[in-house]
């Protein structure tokens, strides 16, 4: 079975996986019984994912002073989408309702062909994106590599001496960016001593006990991590959120600015975004670059369109270097991906790879995607010039069957748009 793809799904915060049919629309946090112990629970997340600033420390990601670049609607909209998944007939509308989507936006050639919101969400709602955040971190790092400011072959400790004695010290920048480095990091939520719990305690997703004496910030936590066994860096894919927070630390060290500022200067202020974004931070103000971004669906679609446009925004300005986009679009190490327990025959991500903090399909269209638990997607198809954004509040963090259904729906959407 596929391993968990994000460390933010802590069982203690999840509560019951059974979802109530009643939506969050029109309800207050009090009426929904939300407290620090159930922020990610199956019912409460329909409210919390749309209102994370009420619960977490955050920093702003400034969209800049320029006028937003408005997305226009295509003359021909996406019609009803019907598809088969493992022999079962499904519809796009039925799947979105089943998966508890909050927003679904599709762009073709830079124009909206489908836009839909659920459960009180609107085009102005800043929605929690979980591990989709990783891909923003990765593409900024890839940009610094393209500019010569960051070198993939150089060891992490050359940039961050504070990590010299940790598992990251002798790992290369590229291995950490592609998550093939050796780090002992457990995501066994039934084990209270698992590293995932300490990681999440640093930003408030898990409570610190009165007698807790472990790391209290993201950077403190990263410096405590060690290797596991004798596995060499680069041998196999090992997806852990700690890697992304190291990449963000690299970005801050090279740029000399906080991550939220770099994200604003490099991306958010360059794409004509409709709104600022915000990102969850720890007590020191360090951003949770592995899973803390909150943004509107339309703004995420603009980011996706920049990727399929080889780094250009909607008015043709070069925002990120084409080399960074191509490096991502070319995909990663398929063998390492499969050795890590992903991508084997019959798995939902069969034949995929991981590059620059994106999941790569390795299909003929060179499509790749940003993924976050509970149903967050930014899927980009550079060949067909299609971007698909989904925000959701799914009742479970990971569901391979639902991921498979989503991919079947995406194939049907792209096929229909190709024929229009």
Where are these regions (language model features)?
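Catalytic-site signature segments of enzymes, centered on catalytic residues
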Residues: 123-124, 188-190, 202-284
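Structured C-terminal helix/loop/strand segments within mature extracytoplasmic catalytic/sensor domains
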Residues: 22-35, 367-420
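Gram-negative bacterial Sec-dependent N-terminal signal peptides
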Residues: 1-21
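Active-site Gly/Thr loop motif
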Residues: 273-278, 329-387
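Active-site-proximal alpha-helical segments within enzyme catalytic domains
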Residues: 178-179, 242-250, 289-313, 376-392
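N-terminal leader/targeting segments and the immediately adjacent pre-domain N-terminus
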Residues: 19-121, 178, 182, 222-224, ...
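Active-site helix/loop module of the DD-peptidase/beta-lactamase fold
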Residues: 146-188, 257-291, 295
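Active-site SXXK
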Residues: 110, 128-152, 176, 247-251, ...
């Amino acid at each position: 079975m596929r391993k968990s793809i994000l460390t933010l799904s802590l069982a203690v915060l999840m509560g019951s996986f059974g979802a109530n049919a009643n939506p969050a629309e029109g309800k207050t946090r009090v009426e929904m019984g939300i407290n620090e112990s159930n922020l990610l629970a199956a019912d409460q997340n329909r409210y919390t994912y749309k209102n994370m600033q009420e619960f977490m420390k955050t920093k702003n990601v400034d969209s800049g002073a320029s006028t937003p670049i408005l997305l226009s609607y295509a003359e021909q909209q996406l019609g009803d989408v019907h598809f088969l998944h493992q022999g079962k007939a499904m519809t796009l509308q039925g799947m979105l309702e089943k998966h508890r989507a909050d927003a679904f936006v599709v762009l073709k050639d830079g124009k909206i062909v489908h836009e839909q919101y659920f459960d009180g969400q609107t085009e102005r709602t800043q929605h929690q994106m979980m591990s989709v955040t990783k891909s923003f971190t990765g593409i900024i790092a890839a940009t610094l590599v393209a500019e010569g400011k960051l070198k993939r072959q150089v060891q992490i400790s050359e940039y961050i001496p504070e990590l010299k004695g940790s598992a990251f010290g002798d790992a290369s920048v590229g291995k950490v960016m592609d998550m093939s480095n050796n780090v002992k990091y457990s995501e066994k939520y039934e084990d209270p001593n698992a590293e995932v719990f300490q990681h999440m305690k640093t930003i408030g997703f898990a409570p610190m006990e009165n007698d807790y004496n472990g790391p209290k910030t993201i950077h403190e936590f990263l410096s405590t991590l060690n290797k596991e066994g004798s596995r060499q860096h680069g041998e196999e894919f090992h997806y852990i959120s700690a890697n992304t927070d190291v990449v963000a630390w690299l970005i801050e060290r090279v740029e000399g600015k906080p991550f939220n500022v770099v994200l604003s200067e490099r991306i958010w202020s360059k794409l004509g975004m409709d709104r600022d974004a915000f990102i969850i931070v720890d007590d020191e103000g360090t951003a949770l670059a592995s899973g803390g971004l909150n943004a509107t669906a339309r703004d995420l679609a603009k980011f996706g369109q920049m990727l399929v446009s080889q780094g250009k925004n909607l008015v043709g300005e070069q925002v990120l270097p084409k080399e960074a986009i191509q490096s991502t679009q070319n995909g990663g190490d398929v063998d390492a991906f499969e050795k890590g327990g992903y991508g084997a025959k019959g798995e939902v991500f069969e034949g995929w790879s991981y590059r620059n903090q994106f999941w790569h399909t390795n299909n003929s269209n060179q499509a790749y995607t940003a993924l976050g638990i509970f149903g967050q997607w930014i899927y980009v198809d550079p060949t067909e010039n299609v971007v698909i954004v989904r925000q959701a509040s799914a009742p479970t963090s990971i569901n391979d069957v639902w991921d498979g259904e989503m991919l079947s729906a995406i194939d049907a959407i792209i096929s229909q748009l190709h024929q229009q």
